[in-house]
A protein has these predicted regions:
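Amphipathic terminal alpha-helices
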Residues: 293, 297-305, 309, 313-326
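Conserved Rossmann-fold NAD(P)-dependent oxidoreductase catalytic core, especially the SDR/UDP-sugar
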Residues: 94-136, 158
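Glycine-rich Rossmann NAD(P)(H)-binding loop
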Residues: 6, 167, 192-198, 227-234, ...
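N-terminal Rossmann NAD(P)H-binding glycine-rich loop of SDR-like oxidoreductase domains
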Residues: 1-23
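NAD(P)H-binding glycine-rich loop region in Rossmannoid oxidoreductase-like domains
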Residues: 45-89, 98, 118
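Mid/C-terminal beta-alpha module of Rossmann-like enzyme folds, strongest
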Residues: 215-282, 299, 315, 319-320
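Conserved beta-loop-beta element that borders a ligand/cofactor-binding pocket
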Residues: 144-168
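A conserved pocket-lining segment of Rossmann-fold NAD(P)-dependent short-chain dehydrogenase/reductase
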Residues: 180-203, 207, 211-214, 228
Length: 326
């Protein structure tokens, strides 16, 4: 099989590429800079230039390819709405059209559980009516819809929705800021928002990378399917706080803020973040709405059809991650 992965040098992409190489696959990976090209060459991955913002580069990724794994994305929760739609929605639709045109046999798309959004009656699953909370999740959901529209013309696809990724190598996203806030004794290691009973579900990057590899290995069972990949259980925020405090050697959280008070305080840090261009979502008011809504999902479908079996539990994975952060 001729396999190409976009975003092959990113956080998830790096783990996925390593996983496939360890299984004996050969593959191509896209890059957008000379430094990233060298990273791929060092792994014996054939580098292919592609930039989500330059549509003319898309044919490079789909030519002479049987399976295209589209991992590249505009990933932030504090970005520009126009870029979400340009780079996540429109670019995905055009790439899927190019894949169909060039005879790609399977288009595997990395979406997110943010395409589902918060869940009123957890756990949510692949059939849960979506109600994404952030523009990032809305863009992922719209990209999924684009893929299904193109699939009506003959494109074979698989959509994968990982939950919140974490693990060694992760920087500058919501998991990174949340974990390092505890590791460095920041604001979120001192005070919690609300009562802490809301459910949250994480996914270690290595488990998700292995899940994507299973999709490649089980093409028949994964055809035109949607899968959620995550750890096999959710945690209350209180449980997460306890785990992080123990690992970081911090005293247990004793104090909490009401969501209303937290929003008032964060209105000042929100303004600061906007002025400074700081993408840390923990400084934004809308983090309160996120923390006070359930994000818990079932992975039973992936277990049943793919044989997906995540190895990492949160305490083990967070300990490994914090040690990597140093």
């Amino acid at each position: 099989l001729r396999i190409t992965a976009t975003g092959a040098t990113g956080f998830l992409g790096s783990y996925f590429v390593d996983n496939l190489i360890n299984k004996g696959f050969t593959l191509r990976g896209t890059h957008y800079s000379p430094g990233k090209k060298q990273t791929l060459l060092s792994k014996n991955v054939q580098p292919v230039y592609m930039d989500l913002g330059r549509l003319g580069t898309f044919p490079n990724a789909v030519k002479d390819t049987d399976i295209l794994i589209h991992l590249a994305a505009y990933y932030t929760f504090t970005g520009k709405r126009s870029l979400y739609y340009k780079l996540n929605v429109d670019a995905t639709g055009i790439l899927a059209e190019q894949a169909l045109k060039h005879g790609v046999k399977r288009f595997i798309y990395c979406s997110s559980t943010e395409a589902i959004g918060p869940v009123d009656n957890p756990p949510g699953d692949e059939e849960t009516p979506p109600s994404p909370q952030f523009d990032y999740g809305r863009s992922k959901l719209l990209a999924e819809q684009k893929i299904r529209e193109i699939a009506a013309n003959g494109l074979s696809y698989t959509i994968v929705r990982p939950s919140g990724l974490y693990g060694p190598g992760n920087v500058n996203d919501v998991s990174y800021w949340f974990i390092t806030s505890f590791a460095k004794g920041g604001f979120f290691s001192k005070l919690k928002i609300g009562r802490g009973g809301t459910l949250i579900q994480f996914a270690h990057v290595d488990d998700v990378a292995k899940g994507f590899a299973l999709v490649v290995e089980r093409l028949e069972k994964s055809e035109n399917q949607v899968f959620i990949l995550s750890e096999d259980r959710a945690y209350t925020y209180n449980e997460v706080y306890k785990i992080l405090s123990e690992i970081a050697g911090n005293p247990p959280l004793k104090y909490s803020l009401s969501p209303k008070t937290a929003k008032l305080i964060l209105s000042f840090t929100h303004l600061y973040a906007l002025v400074k261009g700081d993408n840390n979502i923990l400084l934004r008011r809308n983090i309160v709405d996120s923390i006070t809504k359930h994000r818990a999902y079932s992975i039973e479908k992936a277990k049943r059809l793919l044989g997906y079996s995540p190895r990492y539990y949160l305490k083990e994975g967070l300990k490994e991650t914090i040690e990597w952060y140093g």
